[in-house]
Amino acid sequence: MEAKAGPTAATDGAYSVSAEETEKWMEQAMQMAKDALDNTEVPVGCLMVYNNEVVGKGRNEVNQTKNATRHAEMVAIDQALDWCRRRGRSPSEVFEHTVLYVTVEPCIMCAAALRLMRIPLVVYGCQNERFGGCGSVLDIASADLPSTGKPFQCTPGYRAEEAVEMLKTFYKQENPNAPKSKVRKKECHKS
């Protein structure tokens, strides 16, 4: 019987994944981010991998659903919970051995959810300078927070430039779901 590849825990509790695994899963996350961009969503894609199997995946669905909480990580968490239910598996056992691969640093909301779900390792692309929950704005990942589970490890910077370029492309385009501006522009009268 072939052993399944996956995250390995060191004696100090640190998790690690191979470069090959990281490349494989981050490529799929990047494809999901591109799909989000093609659908006028903020280009973030992620995968939750347990025992070398994708148990949850997501891309941003905020504009599509008109629900500000439908970030890629939240969509993936919902899918992983469904995966556990369908297989009669304990979510806590699965999540404690699941690695999340995501193209952009999780926001504060998503980092808090990942911590509550006890995800041990998050591999991400670029930093989220506005809302980052893994150290860019707040450090939900490793802060001493009561009743929130164990801190999780972060491996930042994987294909960061590519993730930033997708974000730039998104923010250059018009968002058809954005509310209309209520600011009145003064007309210039030339004499």
Curated annotation (Swiss-Prot):
Its EC number is 3.5.4.33. Disulfide bonds: none annotated. InterPro entries: APOBEC/CMP_deaminase_Zn-bd, CMP_dCMP_dom, Cytidine_deaminase-like, tRNA_aden_deaminase. It catalyses: adenosine(34) in tRNA + H2O + H(+) = inosine(34) in tRNA + NH4(+). Keywords: Hydrolase, Metal-binding, tRNA processing, Zinc. Residues 20-145 form the CMP/dCMP-type deaminase domain. The active site is at E73 (proton donor). It comes from the Eukaryota. It is an enzyme of class 3 (hydrolase). GO terms for biological process: tRNA wobble adenosine to inosine editing. Zn(2+) binds at H71, C107, C110. Signal peptide: none annotated. Its cofactor is Zn(2+). GO terms for molecular function: tRNA-specific adenosine-34 deaminase activity; zinc ion binding. PANTHER family: CYTOSINE DEAMINASE FAMILY MEMBER, TRNA-SPECIFIC ADENOSINE DEAMINASE 2. Probably participates in deamination of adenosine-34 to inosine in many tRNAs. Belongs to the cytidine and deoxycytidylate deaminase family. ADAT2 subfamily. This is tRNA-specific adenosine deaminase 2. The lineage of its organism: Eukaryota, Metazoa, Chordata, Craniata, Vertebrata.
